[in-house]
Amino acid sequence: MDPALRSYHQRLRLYTPVAMGINLAASSQPLDPEGPIAVTPRPPIRPSSGKAPHPEAPRRSPNWATAGEVDVGDELIAISDERGPPRHDRPPLATSTAPSPHPRPPGYTAVVSPMALQAVDAPSLFVAWLAARWLRGASGLGASCVGLRGM
């Protein structure tokens, strides 16, 4: 076996979570859908222009956005003031009842498939790689025996 490939397989076996003594299923906490909703404060929103206002500049009225020169930060502040505090009757990532503006392809379902994903079997991939390499070499040897040159 190629020394680099042997080293790769040794490291692969060495650093898997099971080899390191970590039981991933036991370390994960079960999800509680009735649990408390975690609400974190949003970071302060600053104007997106990046420039501090000039000290002698006149203060703008709250209605100055009608001129069309509002920054992104000011737009976000206005939207958050307009919406008010967050609602606590549903989780933040719950789906709304409004239909999606983007049509879904036929056969699309939002339900997760109950079929578990299969783990990648590294030894079988290695055997397939060896078989492909052998076939490539055998075809090259056969072509050279017949008298054909490399294409």
From Swiss-Prot:
Disulfide bonds: none
Keyword NAD: no
Region (Disordered): 27-107
Keyword Transferase: no
GO cellular component, one term: host cell nucleolus
Main location as per UniProt: host cell
Keywords, ordered alphabetically: Host nucleus
Bias (Basic and acidic residues): 80-91
InterPro entries: Herpes_US8A (IPR017377)
Compartment list: Host nucleus, Host nucleolus
Protein name: US8.5 protein
